[in-house]
Amino acid sequence: MDIAGRSLVYFSSVSENTHRFVQKLGIPATRIPLHGRIEVDEPYVLILPTYGGGRANPGLDAGGYVPKQVIAFLNNDHNRAQLRGVIAAGNTNFGAEFCYAGDVVSRKCSVPYLYRFELMGTEDDVAAVRTGLAEFWKEQTCHQPSLQSL
């Protein structure tokens, strides 16, 4: 599973659940800070938690599910242009709104929703994400035009 040179960007609140999941992946990743801004210069997959579950109808109102730091990050046109896919964390207690932030980002940014996991994820989630990312980046690379084909 070669994912070297492929970028992960994630946000984790003070609970650190998403951070712990990303650490278990063992893949270099850039963290969106709680305060301040960053800019990413290469294609990436975003991993984010879902906020506010259980308080709105997901079919009607997407407000509050995506952390404000992620919204600010994606409102930067440069960062948004590099986004290739999204993975979301959530809590199954919120039913249909489980990992709903991933649905919001996928829809608004027109990128694939690659995976969802609960809280800090399980060992099976870690293995599935590592394998899935390797396959995803391989597919992305296959669809890049080479200089010879231009």
Swiss-Prot record:
Source organism superkingdom: Bacteria
Alphabetical GO biological process terms: protein modification process
GO MF annotations in UniProt: FMN binding
One Pfam family per UniProt: Flavodoxin_NdrI
SUPFAM superfamilies: Flavoproteins (SSF52218)
Functional summary from the UniProt entry: Probably involved in ribonucleotide reductase function.
Protein family per UniProt: Belongs to the NrdI family.
Name of this protein: Protein NrdI
